[in-house]
């Protein structure tokens, strides 16, 4: 089956892992995603309905606008994908406009421009909540018109919420399946890792996410979580069935060294015996 790409570039996006994720994702009527990101799993599955959430208000506002005002949004966004906008001076002017803009529609248009023209498709904010990704210097950024229309069509069966992972997971019922793609865990308890939003994701929150998954599966609601394969994640997900995906992603650790890390898929499935928590 042909894979559908997201219209946003996204750090840590799950497009390369779709086959593995779908292989282990349980069946159900509704998919709940507390960390929707660019939405690759949503775009490549066939649930009857979707509950999609993220803590990034710009992202959720964008998705609701694409869902409800598709043609208007595509037309307005296309106007920024021109040779004359592909220069640093214009980029920084539009970035400044984004950071002061109060109009949700214009802000959503600028968000797509910044995503495609900014460095590596990063979505990063400073402590004041200002988008601060530098200019990317790409030859000709791609305007994702087909991807926008596909997203909008698929989104007619989705509800988008800007809220915490705990709040969105609380929306799951017996007809739901939950897929969690939290910010990647650090390599160790002392390692630093990138925060893509001003609210960084702590070790306490990583462990709390696993506890919520355990509670949901005890109520017969399956949960699949993806993360780095480390000693920490194996401790957090010790009550799940663990599947290792040989991605061998190279990431920075303390001291500037690079370390190869696989991906871990932790499946909490009702009716599957798991060891007692240590």
Curated annotation (Swiss-Prot):
Q: For S-adenosyl-L-methionine, which residues are the binding ones?
A: 10, 14, 54, 181
Q: Mind telling me which Pfam families this protein's record contains?
A: MethyltransfD12
Q: Name one GO molecular function term.
A: site-specific DNA-methyltransferase (adenine-specific) activity
Going by the UniProt record, its keywords in alphabetical order are:
DNA replication, DNA-binding, Methyltransferase, S-adenosyl-L-methionine, Transferase
Return the InterPro entries for the record: Ade_MeTrfase_dom_2, DNA_methylase_N6_adenine_CS, M_m6A_EcoRV, MeTrfase_D12, SAM-dependent_MTases_sf
Gene Ontology biological-process annotations:
DNA replication; DNA restriction-modification system; methylation; mismatch repair
Reactions mediated catalytically? a 2'-deoxyadenosine in DNA + S-adenosyl-L-methionine = an N(6)-methyl-2'-deoxyadenosine in DNA + S-adenosyl-L-homocysteine + H(+)
* The EC number(s) this enzyme carries: 2.1.1.72
The protein's job, in short, is: May be involved in methyl-directed DNA mismatch repair, initiation of chromosome replication and gene expression.
User: What family name appears in the similarity comment?
Assistant: Belongs to the N(4)/N(6)-methyltransferase family.
Give the protein name, as stated in the record. DNA adenine methylase
According to its UniProt entry, this protein's organism is Salmonella typhimurium (strain LT2 / SGSC1412 / ATCC 700720)
């Amino acid at each position: 089956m042909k894979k559908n790409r997201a219209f946003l570039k996204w750090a840590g996006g799950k497009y390369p892992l779709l086959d593995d994720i779908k292989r282990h994702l349980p069946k159900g009527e509704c998919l709940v995603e507390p960390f929707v990101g660019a939405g690759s799993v949503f775009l490549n599955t066939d649930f009857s309905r979707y509950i999609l959430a993220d803590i990034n208000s710009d992202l959720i506002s964008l998705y609701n606008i694409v869902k409800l005002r598709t043609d208007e949004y595509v037309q307005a966004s296309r106007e920024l994908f021109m040779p004359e906008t592909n220069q640093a001076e214009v980029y920084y002017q539009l970035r400044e406009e984004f950071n002061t803009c109060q109009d949700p529609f214009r802000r959503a248009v600028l968000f797509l421009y910044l995503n495609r023209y900014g460095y590596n498709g990063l979505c990063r904010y400073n402590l004041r909540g200002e988008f601060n990704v530098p200019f990317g210097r790409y030859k000709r950024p791609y305007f994702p018109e087909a991807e926008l229309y596909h997203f909008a069509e698929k989104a007619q069966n989705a509800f988008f919420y800007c809220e915490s992972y705990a709040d969105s997971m609380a929306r799951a019922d017996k007809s739901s399946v939950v897929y969690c793609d939290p910010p990647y865990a650090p390599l160790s308890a002392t390692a630093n890792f990138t925060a893509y939003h001003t609210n960084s994701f702590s070790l306490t929150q990583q462990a709390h996410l696993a506890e919520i998954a355990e509670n949901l599966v005890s109520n017969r609601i399956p949960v699949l979580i993806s993360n780095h394969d480390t000693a920490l994640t194996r401790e957090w997900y010790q009550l799940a069935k663990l599947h290792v995906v040989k991605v061998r992603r190279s990431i920075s650790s303390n001291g500037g060294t690079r370390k190869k890390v696989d991906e871990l898929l932790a499946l909490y499935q009702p009716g599957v015996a798991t060891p007692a928590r240590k």
